[in-house]
């Protein structure tokens, strides 16, 4: 009997390992390259991650595409950051989401540069693709979308906030 219980316990281990980490709707996330911790909205309705930036400019370095930008967040200094450009993200506009576009025409899409950032939430450090755009008209300078939430093997408690505490990476 003890052998059967032991084997049954081993079979159950993968189910326990697959349990998602539970985060609140808002979390503190540290951006390693920048050395800042920002409040972030964990948004399952958005696909990608987005960071509030200004003075966004694409340029060439040694034959590669790069982007330079400044943070557009409260308390940010005037530091100019440079990252290798990973691609361009085409994001639905609010007009398209609301159905306020001509169905016979190509809907307008916002094009945003995408960079790789190391993000720390709780004790998890992940390389994440983040698009850059001015989010100063939003309450949270960093948005974490469904792709990153899935990569973190996470689930979101919509009624909870800051369940992971301050980042420890």
Briefly describe each language-model feature range.
Residues 8-17:
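Hydrophobic h-region of N-terminal signal peptides that target proteins for export
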């Amino acid at each position: 009997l003890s052998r059967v219980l032991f084997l049954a316990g081993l079979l159950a281990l993968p189910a326990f390992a697959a349990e998602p980490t539970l985060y609140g709707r808002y979390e503190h996330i540290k951006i390693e390259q920048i050395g800042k911790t920002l409040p972030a909205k964990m948004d399952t309705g958005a696909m990608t991650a987005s960071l509030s930036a200004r003075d966004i400019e694409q340029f060439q370095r040694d034959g590669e595409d790069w982007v330079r930008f400044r943070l557009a967040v409260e308390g940010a200094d005037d530091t100019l950051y440079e990252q290798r450009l990973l691609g361009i993200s085409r994001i639905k506009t609010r007009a398209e989401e609301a159905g306020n576009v001509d169905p016979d025409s190509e809907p307008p899409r916002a094009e945003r540069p995408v960079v790789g950032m190391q993000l720390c939430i709780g004790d998890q450090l992940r390389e994440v693709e983040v698009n850059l755009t001015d989010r100063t008209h939003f309450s949270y300078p960093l948005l974490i979308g469904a792709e990153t939430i899935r990569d973190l093997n996470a689930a979101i408690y919509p009624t909870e906030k800051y369940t992971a505490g301050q980042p420890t990476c």
